[in-house]
Design a protein with these regions (language model features):
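Membrane-proximal, glycine/serine-rich, low-complexity loop/turn segments characteristic
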Residues: 19, 29-32, 61-63, 75, ...
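Short, ordered, surface-exposed loop/turn motifs in non-cytosolic proteins
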Residues: 30-46
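Short, acidic Ser/Thr/Gly-rich low-complexity loop/linker segments typical of extracellular
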Residues: 46-63
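Outer-membrane beta-barrel translocator domains and adjoining extracellular loop/strand segments
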Residues: 212-213, 268, 277-283, 331-349, ...
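Outer membrane beta-barrel strand-and-loop segments of large Gram-negative receptors
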Residues: 353, 486-488, 528-532, 633, ...
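Signature of Gram-negative outer-membrane beta-barrel scaffolds
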Residues: 502-602, 779, 784
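Conserved C-terminal beta-signal and adjacent last beta-strands/turns
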Residues: 751-773, 785-893
C-alpha cells in the first residue's frame, strides 16, 4: 500500500509543485488587463464526505493568495464575465513553499459586451467584482456640464419626472465615499461633471450583512461618487432669477461646500409663482400648482464627518445641524359640484364656490448624529423642532338644489365667512443603539413626538331659505387648544442561527396621550352642543417574529405581528358624557418570497393580512351641529376591517436585447369597509353624515412595463395597467325610507401608455399616446352608469445646436363620459423654451412660454357608490417668462 501511494505521489509530482501557499492573478482574456475585485472560491476535500472552503477577493492588481494543501478546486467569478474553474494540488511539508498558478483569464459575457461602448480609447465602464465603475472622461459632455447631465447618460440610469434616480428599474441614492451625500440629490445639478473622478454603481449591503456576511435581504442600490482631490473643500451652487408675465417673479440661491469632513449647505428662495421649496439636512421638498401664492425662505446646514481605523475597518461618524425660516402666503378661488344619489332616479345637487387665503411663518431646526465608537456599536440620534404661526380667511357660498323632475330647483343658500388664527409647536426625536456580534445584532431604540397647538375661529353664517324667502344670521366663535404625546420605545434582535437561517424578533410599545378641548359660542352665548372635551389614552404592545431563510437563489421571509391594544377615551359634549374603553388583540401574518433568477432577473411574491379598526371617537354616539346644514355624528356599531393582499412581481433587465420588463399583479379582499353614509331631510334641507359598515371591497391590478432599445437611436416604452374592483356604499337616505339601500359599484379600468423615443446627436424626440378608460356600473343607481375617458397624446422635441437648446411639448387631453359638460372637453397644452448657454456654460438664459393656447382648466372629478363630485381651482398658467441661472464653480487647487 505504501509503495502504491509513493508511486501515485511521484506521478503527480511530474505535473505539480509541492506547496501550501497558492497565488495567482485574474485578468481579462481579451485586453489582458487585471481584474481587481474578482472572487476566488476554493473548495478542499477533507474526507470522502466532508469539505472545507473559503473565498478571497483579488486585490487592486488582480492578485490573490491563500493557504491550503492537498487537492483544491478553484472557481473564479466576476460580474459581467463567465466563470472559470481550475483544479490545483499542493503537497508540501513546508509552510514557506509557494505555488504560483499564473494568470486566470476570464472572458467577458455577451451581455456585458453589448453594454460596453468605447469613446476614443477610454472605456465607459469597467467591472470590479460586483461593482460597475463608470469613467466620466469617456462620456461626451459640453464644457461646464453639470453632474446630472453625466448621470443621465450612464447606461441603465434614468431620472423620472420628480428627479428621482433609477438604476435598471430600482431606486438608487447618491453617496460620496460610501456615505450619504450632504445636500442630497440637489447637489448633482450644481457640481460640475469634471469634478468627478469616477462613479461606482453597486448594491450596498446592510450593516448586518457587513458584520455577519449573510444576506438579510436588505440592500440599497447606490451611485457612489469619487471626487477629484482638487475639487474638494470648495463651494458650488446655482443662482437663478426669473420673471413671468403678469408680474410674477422667482429667485433662489443654492450653495454647497463639498467636503469629506465639513460640508455646508446654504439655501435662499423668494417667489410669487406658488412654488414651495424647503431644504434642510436630508430633506428637500418642492411643490407648486396649488392655487396662487408667494414664499420667502432661507435655510442652512453644517455637518462634521470624522473617521478612525480599527483593524481593517474604517469607522465613519458624523453630526449635523440645519435650520431655516420660511414665510408662505397662499390664495385661491375654487369650486365644487356635488351630486348625491337618492333611491330611484332622484338626486340632489349642490354647488360651492369659495376663496381662501392663508399666511404661515415656519421656523425649523434639525439635528442628527451617527457615532461608531467601535466596529460593533452604532449610536444614532435625530431631532426636529418646528413651529408654525398661521392665520387664514375664507369665503364660501353653497347653493343646494333638488331634482324636481324638470331639472334642479334651488332650495337654500349658505354664505360662510371664516377668520382663523393659530399656532403649533412640534418636537420629534428618535434614537437607537445597535450592537453587532458575530451572528447578529441587538438594537434598542425609541422615539418621542410632542405637539402643542391652539386655534381660534370666527365664523359668520348667512342662511337663506328660497321657499320661505327668509334669512338667518349666525355668529360663531371657537377656541380649540390641543396637545398630543407619542412614545415609541422598541427593541430588535436578529440572529443567524445557521449560515442560511436568520431569526428576528421585535418588540414595540406605543403610548398615546391626546387632549383636545373646544369652547364654542353662538351669537355670544355659550353653545354646549358644539363645545366638547376629549381625552384619549392608548397603550399598545406589538411583538413581531420573523425569519430570513436563504435556499440557493431563493429567499423566504415569513413574519407575524401580534398586537394587543387598549384605548381609553373620555368624551363630554352637551348632555353626552361618556367613557369608552376598547381592548383588542390582533395577529397580522405576512410572507415574502424572493427568487433571484439571475443578477438581472428576480421574482417576488408577497402576502399580508391586516386588521384596521375605526377610530374610537367614531364609535361614540356624538353629534356635531357646528354647521347647521351639515351634521356629523358617530356610530357605536362600526366593525373592524380585515384585508388579505396577494402580490407577485417580476423584474428583468436583458442587456443583450436592450430590454427591461416589469410585471406586477395584486389582488386585495376586505370583509368590511367603513364609509360615510348621508341622510337628507327635504323639509329642513339638512344633511347628516354618519359612518357605516358595508360589505368589503374586492380589488385587482395587473401592470406590465416594457422598455426596449431599438438599435442605437430608438427606444420603445409601454406601460399597461388593468385595474378593477367591487365597492359598496349607501344611497342618500330620505325620511320616507325605513332603511338604507346598499349600492354596489363595479369598476374596470384599463390604462395604457405607449411612447416612442428618438435620441441621436443633437436631436431628442418622443411621441406618445395614452388610453385611460374607467367603466363604472351601479346596481341601484343605473342612471349613473358611465364610462369615463381620460385620453391624451402628444409629442416632445429637443434640439441642441452649439450653445442653444430648443424644446417644445404638445399634448392633447380628451375627457368624455362625465355628467358635467365642463369636464367633457378637449384641452391642447403647448409649451416652448429656448436656452442660451453663456459664460462657458457656467450660465444660461432661458426664454419660455407655458400653456400658450390658454387651455389648462385644472378640473378633476371623483365618483363613488353614493356621490359624484367635480372640482376646479385657480392655478398659474398661460404665461411667458425669462430666467438667468449662474453656476458657481470652484477652481481646482
Amino acid at each position: 500500500m505504501r509503495a502504491f501511494a509513493t508511486t501515485i505521489l511521484l506521478v503527480f509530482s511530474a505535473f505539480i509543485a509541492h506547496a501550501d501557499i497558492i497565488s495567482g492573478r485574474v485578468i481579462d482574456a481579451d485586453t489582458k488587463e487585471t481584474l481587481p475585485g474578482a472572487t476566488v472560491q476554493y473548495l478542499q476535500q477533507i474526507t470522502e464526505t466532508s469539505y472545507s472552503g473559503s473565498t478571497v477577493i483579488a486585490d487592486s492588481l488582480g492578485r490573490f493568495t491563500f493557504f491550503t494543501d492537498g487537492r483544491v478546486a478553484l472557481e473564479v467569478s466576476m460580474l459581467g464575465y463567465y466563470n472559470k474553474k481550475k483544479n490545483v494540488m499542493a503537497l508540501s511539508d513546508s509552510h514557506k513553499d509557494t505555488l504560483n498558478i499564473g494568470s486566470i483569464e476570464l472572458k467577458m459575457s455577451s451581455q456585458m459586451l453589448q453594454m460596453v461602448e468605447v469613446t476614443g480609447h477610454a472605456k465607459r465602464f469597467t467591472m470590479h467584482g460586483d461593482t460597475i465603475v463608470f469613467n466620466p472622461s469617456a462620456f461626451r459632455l459640453q464644457e461646464g456640464a453639470r453632474l446630472d447631465e453625466l448621470i443621465k447618460q450612464l447606461p441603465g440610469v434614468e431620472a423620472d419626472a420628480e428627479g428621482k434616480l433609477w438604476w435598471n428599474g430600482k431606486p438608487i441614492r447618491l453617496t460620496m465615499g460610501g456615505e450619504s451625500l450632504f445636500g442630497g440629490n440637489d447637489l448633482v445639478s450644481q457640481l460640475p461633471a469634471e469634478a468627478v473622478q469616477n462613479i461606482k454603481a453597486y448594491n450596498k449591503a446592510s450593516e448586518l450583512k457587513e458584520h455577519t456576511g449573510n444576506d438579510d435581504g436588505n440592500e440599497d442600490m447606490v451611485l457612489d461618487l469619487t471626487i477629484k482631490p482638487g475639487f474638494l473643500d470648495r463651494w458650488y451652487g446655482d443662482a437663478t432669477a426669473g420673471y413671468r408675465t403678469r408680474d410674477h417673479y422667482e429667485a433662489d440661491v443654492q450653495l454647497n461646500r463639498l467636503s469629506t469632513s465639513d460640508p455646508v449647505m446654504v439655501f435662499g428662495d423668494a417667489n410669487n409663482v406658488a412654488k414651495r421649496h424647503r431644504r434642510y439636512q436630508g430633506q428637500s421638498v418642492m411643490s407648486s400648482g396649488n392655487g396662487l401664492g408667494q414664499e420667502q425662505g432661507i435655510s442652512g446646514g453644517y455637518q462634521h464627518n470624522w473617521s478612525r481605523e480599527q483593524g481593517d475597518k474604517t469607522l465613519n461618524s458624523y453630526y449635523s445641524v440645519s435650520g431655516g425660516l420660511a414665510h408662505d402666503d397662499r390664495w385661491k378661488s375654487s369650486g365644487r359640484e356635488t351630486e348625491n344619489y337618492f333611491p330611484g332616479e332622484a338626486q340632489s345637487y349642490s354647488k360651492t364656490t369659495g376663496f381662501d387665503r392663508s399666511h404661515e411663518l415656519n421656523p425649523t431646526i434639525l439635528g442628527m448624529m451617527r457615532w461608531r465608537p467601535d466596529s460593533t456599536n452604532t449610536i444614532f440620534l435625530w431631532t426636529q423642532l418646528e413651529h408654525k404661526n398661521n392665520r387664514s380667511t375664507s369665503r364660501q357660498d353653497t347653493e343646494q338644489s333638488v331634482d324636481s323632475g324638470y331639472g334642479y330647483t334651488p332650495t337654500i343658500n349658505q354664505h360662510v365667512g371664516t377668520l382663523g388664527r393659530g399656532h403649533q409647536t412640534e418636537i420629534r426625536t428618535s434614537g437607537s443603539w445597535t450592537h453587532y456580534f458575530k451572528d447578529g445584532s441587538l438594537k434598542i431604540g425609541g422615539g418621542l413626538n410632542y405637539t402643542d397647538s391652539k386655534s381660534k375661529q370666527w365664523i359668520d353664517r348667512t342662511i337663506t331659505d328660497y321657499q320661505s324667502n327668509l334669512s338667518s344670521v349666525l355668529s360663531q366663535y371657537a377656541v380649540e387648544p390641543s396637545s398630543k404625546l407619542l412614545l415609541m420605545p422598541s427593541i430588535t434582535y436578529e440572529h443567524w442561527m445557521t449560515k442560511h437561517w436568520m431569526l428576528n424578533m421585535d418588540y414595540r410599545l406605543d403610548y398615546n396621550n391626546n387632549r383636545i378641548d373646544r369652547d364654542f359660542t353662538t351669537d355670544g352665548i355659550a353653545d354646549a352642543a358644539n363645545s366638547f372635551s376629549n381625552r384619549y389614552h392608548n397603550i399598545g404592545h406589538t411583538v413581531t417574529a420573523g425569519s430570513t431563510i436563504n435556499i440557493g437563489q431563493v429567499q423566504l421571509m415569513p413574519s407575524a405581528a401580534l398586537n394587543w391594544n387598549r384605548e381609553h377615551q373620555d368624551y363630554a359634549r352637551a348632555l353626552l358624557d361618556t367613557t369608552a374603553i376598547r381592548s383588542r388583540f390582533k395577529v397580522e401574518p405576512s410572507f415574502k418570497v424572493t427568487w433571484k433568477v439571475r443578477k438581472t432577473q428576480s421574482i417576488e411574491l408577497n402576502y399580508s393580512y391586516k386588521t384596521t379598526r375605526p377610530e374610537l371617537l367614531q364609535t361614540i354616539g356624538y353629534r356635531d351641529l357646528s354647521d347647521p346644514l351639515f351634521i356629523t355624528e358617530g356610530n357605536p356599531f362600526l366593525k373592524d376591517s380585515h384585508t388579505n393582499q396577494f402580490q407577485m412581481s417580476y423584474k428583468a433587465v436583458l442587456p443583450s436585447h436592450q430590454l427591461s420588463i416589469g410585471f406586477n399583479a395584486k389582488y386585495s379582499t376586505t370583509d368590511h369597509s367603513n364609509i360615510s353614509a348621508l341622510s337628507y331631510d327635504p323639509a329642513t334641507n339638512v344633511y347628516t353624515s354618519r359612518p357605516e359598515s358595508v360589505p368589503g371591497s374586492r380589488t385587482w391590478e395587473v401592470n406590465l412595463n416594457y422598455d426596449h432599445g431599438l438599435g442605437n437611436y430608438f427606444r420603445l416604452q409601454n406601460d399597461l395597467k388593468m385595474m378593477g374592483g367591487r365597492y359598496y356604499g349607501y344611497l342618500t337616505m330620505l325620511p320616507t325610507h325605513g332603511e338604507r339601500i346598499l349600492n354596489r359599484q363595479t369598476s374596470v379600468h384599463p390604462k395604457d401608455k405607449l411612447t416612442v423615443l428618438f435620441d441621436h446627436n443633437w436631436i431628442k424626440a418622443a411621441v406618445f399616446a395614452e388610453l385611460n378608460a374607467d367603466r363604472l356600473r351601479f346596481s341601484q343607481s343605473q342612471s349613473q352608469n358611465t364610462t369615463l375617458w381620460n385620453n391624451n397624446y402628444g409629442m416632445s422635441f429637443e434640439a441642441n445646436y452649439r450653445n442653444f437648446v430648443f424644446t417644445t411639448g404638445l399634448t392633447e387631453y380628451m375627457r368624455r363620459g362625465y355628467a358635467s359638460s365642463d369636464m367633457n372637453r378637449d384641452n391642447l397644452l403647448w409649451g416652448v423654451s429656448i436656452t442660451w448657454k453663456v459664460l462657458k456654460n457656467k450660465g444660461n438664459v432661458k426664454l419660455f412660454a407655458e400653456d400658450i393656447l390658454n387651455q389648462d382648466d385644472w378640473r378633476w372629478s371623483s365618483q363613488s357608490a353614493y356621490q359624484q363630485t367635480n372640482e376646479w381651482q385657480d392655478t398659474l398658467h398661460h404665461y411667458i417668462g425669462i430666467s438667468f441661472t449662474y453656476h458657481l464653480d470652484a477652481k481646482t487647487k
